[in-house]
């Protein structure tokens, strides 16, 4: 980088006032005075009155450095000189007055660098003012304010709209979402074994996972184990849970939930329990399920037939008897085929308990 040349003349200048610099410097001074009048530039933040010397300038003989990085020249007897733009009182001609602003005109790159340095000095002298936001910043701030001040577009605007949306989303949302399926196996008690008593109970959740599966000892003597259908044998009753204890455990699971079953009234009768009709789903009396199986709507179809027709699966086969876990899982899968349609029907025609 080439050094700047300073042409100094210590002779007597002409009596007329020295020029204040080129057009760019005059424009700079004009803007600085405007900022001073408006209060943006205080005296404390004004650039130094003396023309700053570049760091590349060597110190002259007799000069001493000061705190602000300039070099102090010893004072000499004052002479009558014309007022210069830097107010130093030294006789400077036009070239000397603007030498720190105008670099050597030999190279264009040096001129651009000098202008950048000048702009940096001017900006550093200005007080810190909040800069105006750009377009992108304005847009982002407007979006943030709109999100805070206005409700979301997807949110319902009033209670009527919210009610209509909830109605369209399905009646199943208004009912308890916890749903279980139950199946019970009975044995014969009483005279000639005509009384059906609970001997095994299985409960599965919505996904078919087993929540409860226990053998239950009836309070009365077992006359007929009905092994061909129930799968219950004498050895199953050795460590079976007493009916009273098992009933309390089962009702604790069923309370407050939607209970699905096939011919479920028989299971509730064996449990000596009444479940609300609004929370009961009996797959033996669901017309849409019969329609899917190409059966008469009002006919009572067996669980085995519906499972084979709709799930393409065989259950209750062999001579070992039924599995209450398998039957409960099949019942839940059948109900899930018509769940949305049947829940909407029940919402329009709620059953009375």
Swiss-Prot record:
It comes from Homo sapiens. This is Interferon-stimulated 20 kDa exonuclease-like 2. Residues 178-353 form the Exonuclease domain. Residues 152-172 have a biased composition (Polar residues). CDD domains: ISG20. Residues 14-23, 54-63 have a biased composition (Basic and acidic residues). The lineage of its organism: Eukaryota, Metazoa, Chordata, Craniata, Vertebrata. Pfam families: RNase_T. Residues 24-35, 135-151 have a biased composition (Basic residues). It comes from the Eukaryota. The keyword Nucleus applies. Keywords: Exonuclease, Hydrolase, Nuclease, Nucleus, Ribosome biogenesis. GO terms for biological process: ribosome biogenesis; RNA processing. Its EC number is 3.1.-.-. Residues 1-93, 125-172 are annotated as: Disordered. One of its GO terms (molecular function) is exonuclease activity.
């Amino acid at each position: 980088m080439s050094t700047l040349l300073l042409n100094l003349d210590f002779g007597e200048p002409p009596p007329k006032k020295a020029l204040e610099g080129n057009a760019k410097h005059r424009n700079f001074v004009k803007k600085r005075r405007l900022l001073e009048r408006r209060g943006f530039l205080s005296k404390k933040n004004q650039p130094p009155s003396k023309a700053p010397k570049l760091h590349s300038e060597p110190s002259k003989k007799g000069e001493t450095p000061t705190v602000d990085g300039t070099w102090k020249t010893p004072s000499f007897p004052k002479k009558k000189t014309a007022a210069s733009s830097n107010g130093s009182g030294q006789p400077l001609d036009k070239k000397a007055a603007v030498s720190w602003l105008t670099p050597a005109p030999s190279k264009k790159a040096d001129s651009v660098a000098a202008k950048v340095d000048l702009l940096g000095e001017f900006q550093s002298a200005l007080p810190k003012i909040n800069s105006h936001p750009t377009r992108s910043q304005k847009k982002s701030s407007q979006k943030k304010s709109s999100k805070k001040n206005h409700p979301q577009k997807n949110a319902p605007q009033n209670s009527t709209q919210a009610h209509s949306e909830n109605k369209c989303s399905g009646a199943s949302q208004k009912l308890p979402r916890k749903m279980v399926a139950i199946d019970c196996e009975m044995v014969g008690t009483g005279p000639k074994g005509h009384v059906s008593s609970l001997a095994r109970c299985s409960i599965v959740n919505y996904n078919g996972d087993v929540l409860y599966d226990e053998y239950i000892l009836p309070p009365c003597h077992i006359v007929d184990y009905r092994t061909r259908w129930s799968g219950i044998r004498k050895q199953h009753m050795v460590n079976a849970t007493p009916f009273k204890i098992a009933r309390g455990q089962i009702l604790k699971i069923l309370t407050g939930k939607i209970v699905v079953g096939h011919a479920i009234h028989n299971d509730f009768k064996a449990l000596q329990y009444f479940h609300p009709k609004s929370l009961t789903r009996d797959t033996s009396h669901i017309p849409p399920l019969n329609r899917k199986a190409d059966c008469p709507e009002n006919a009572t179809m067996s669980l085995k037939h519906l499972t084979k027709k709709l799930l393409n699966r065989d259950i209750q086969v062999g001579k070992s008897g039924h599995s209450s876990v398998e039957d409960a899982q099949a019942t839940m899968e059948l109900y899930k085929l018509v769940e949305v349609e049947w829940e909407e029907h029940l919402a329009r025609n709620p059953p009375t308990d």
